[in-house]
């Protein structure tokens, strides 16, 4: 167990950040799954900007790597273009 006040505070902060990152990571994964499950192109096109915004924010705050965000955006764009 930590002995210093600052290390106790650090432990509290890390736990808060971990829960925050888990929540937004899970939310992002669910949004991507929902888009991939969509077969309607209009609906997918409407969802895409919100998901890209979410991916960019998570990459900026280091919840996910920036390359992962870019790869997901690229693959989702390809998926949307393939929809008829």
Curated annotation (Swiss-Prot):
One of its GO terms (cellular component) is small ribosomal subunit. GO terms for molecular function: small ribosomal subunit rRNA binding; structural constituent of ribosome. Pfam families: Ribosomal_S20p. GO terms for biological process: translation. NCBIfam families: S20. Belongs to the bacterial ribosomal protein bS20 family. This is Small ribosomal subunit protein bS20. It comes from Bacteroides thetaiotaomicron (strain ATCC 29148 / DSM 2079 / JCM 5827 / CCUG 10774 / NCTC 10582 / VPI-5482 / E50). The gene is rpsT.
